[in-house]
UniProtKB/Swiss-Prot annotation:
Organism lineage string: Bacteria, Pseudomonadati, Pseudomonadota, Betaproteobacteria, Burkholderiales
Record-linked InterPro entries: Aldolase_TIM, Elp3/MiaA/NifB-like_rSAM, LIAS_N, Lipoyl_synth, rSAM
Binding site for [4Fe-4S] cluster 1: C76, C81, C87, S316
PROSITE patterns hit by this protein: RADICAL_SAM (PS51918)
Cofactor(s) required for function per UniProt: [4Fe-4S] cluster
Record's catalysed reaction(s): [[Fe-S] cluster scaffold protein carrying a second [4Fe-4S](2+) cluster] + N(6)-octanoyl-L-lysyl-[protein] + 2 oxidized [2Fe-2S]-[ferredoxin] + 2 S-adenosyl-L-methionine + 4 H(+) = [[Fe-S] cluster scaffold protein] + N(6)-[(R)-dihydrolipoyl]-L-lysyl-[protein] + 4 Fe(3+) + 2 hydrogen sulfide + 2 5'-deoxyadenosine + 2 L-methionine + 2 reduced [2Fe-2S]-[ferredoxin]
Principal location: cytoplasm
Family affiliation: Belongs to the radical SAM superfamily. Lipoyl synthase family.
Pfam family, one: Radical_SAM
Repressor among keywords: no
Top-tier EC class: transferase
Cellular localisation: Cytoplasm
Cofactor descriptive note: Binds 2 [4Fe-4S] clusters per subunit. One cluster is coordinated with 3 cysteines and an exchangeable S-adenosyl-L-methionine.
Protein name from the UniProt record: Lipoyl synthase
Length: 329
């Protein structure tokens, strides 16, 4: 006789507890920000968006191996940069210090969020050894946001700069910093001990989109960081970068460019925003090459010493060539 007794459904697994020390990516990261990401119909990539796939070239594999051996991170990997294949293949990388967990949750960015680990005291020496081993003549050093540190990580930047210059005195150093919000004066005073060859801090987008795209950041504060650094170090080139395609207007981008020049910023990058995953902010427009060309022309009219503008341009993409064009190297 058939047993018609219903079998109880298995109990739903309990929701896993939030672990602030875990590295959160994609949905786990963006689910906890106050701004809800509303999906829109995905735009078809136009023909001018072409990414060179990461390859297994010997140079590509050599860099990845050396990075792992020295327990180092690159923003190329952590932020899923579309140019990683080209850059690694040519022996260049943007080093990301102070760990791989950011204290911010910017929904355009693919770097993981979480409670950061303690600073690695060996990282400056490991970084310098890696740069020397790779015989790099120009390096970019960036970091996650470290709102947990009293100096925002400025002291660690200084230690890295000192170690690189000790082991590779001919190497030019660009730093791409967080905003040091709430600790700007302290951070700038610390950076006085070892200023870089190029000081880069990205505005990322227009002020109207800050609440959506850069929660925890402030447009006016970022401009002040750049201007205050330049006032302290007039001979050091300053630089900033923007993404387009998030819903900004052309006039808004041009106004940001004017704001940058009014705050004594020398160099500019503008590139197309590409959505890292469906859980990140959507692409609202693929900006036409003609518009990028217009931005470039306007940048030089405004007095920027160098402007790298184009769909696949990123803040540190061909940074050595950008610096050379601006007369830094």
């Amino acid at each position: 006789m058939t047993d018609l007794t219903a079998t109880p459904a298995p109990a739903e697994p309990a929701a896993s507890a939030y672990d602030p020390t875990a590295k959160q990516k994609a949905q786990a990261k963006t689910a906890r920000i106050p701004i809800k990401i509303v999906p829109i119909e995905k735009l078809k990539k136009p023909e001018w968006i072409r990414v060179k796939a990461a390859t297994g070239s010997s140079r590509f594999n050599e860099i990845k191996t050396i990075l792992r051996e020295h327990n180092l991170h690159t923003v190329c990997e952590e932020a899923s940069c579309p140019n990683i294949g080209e850059c690694f293949g040519k022996g260049t990388a943007t080093f990301m210090i102070m760990g791989d967990k950011c204290t911010r949750r910017c929904p355009f960015c693919d770097v993981g969020h979480g409670r950061p680990d303690p600073l690695d005291a060996d990282e400056p020496k490991n970084l310098a050894r890696t740069i020397a081993a790779l015989k790099l003549k120009y390096v970019v050093i960036t970091s996650v946001d470290r709102d947990d540190l009293r100096d925002g990580g400025a002291g660690h930047f200084v230690e890295c700069i000192r170690e690189v210059r000790e082991q590779s005195p001919a190497t030019r150093i660009e730093i791409l910093t967080p905003d040091f919000r709430g600790r700007l004066d302290r951070a700038l005073a610390i950076l006085n001990a070892a200023p870089p060859d190029v000081m880069n801090h990205n505005l990322e987008t227009v002020p109207r989109l800050y609440k959506e795209a850069r929660p925890g950041s402030d447009y006016a504060h970022s401009l002040k960081l750049l201007k205050d650094f330049k006032a302290l170090h007039p001979d050091v080139a300053t630089k900033s970068g923007l993404m387009v395609g998030l819903g900004e207007t052309t006039d808004e981008i041009l106004q940001v460019m004017r704001d940058l020049r009014a705050h004594d910023v020398d160099m500019l990058t503008i590139g197309q925003y590409l959505q890292p995953s469906e859980h990140h902010l959507p692409v609202r427009e693929y900006v036409h090459p003609d518009t990028f060309k217009m931005y470039e022309e306007e940048a030089y009219k405004m007095g920027f010493t160098h402007a790298a503008v184009g769909a696949m341009v990123r803040s540190s993409y061909h940074a050595d060539l950008q610096a050379h064009g601006a007369g830094v190297v």
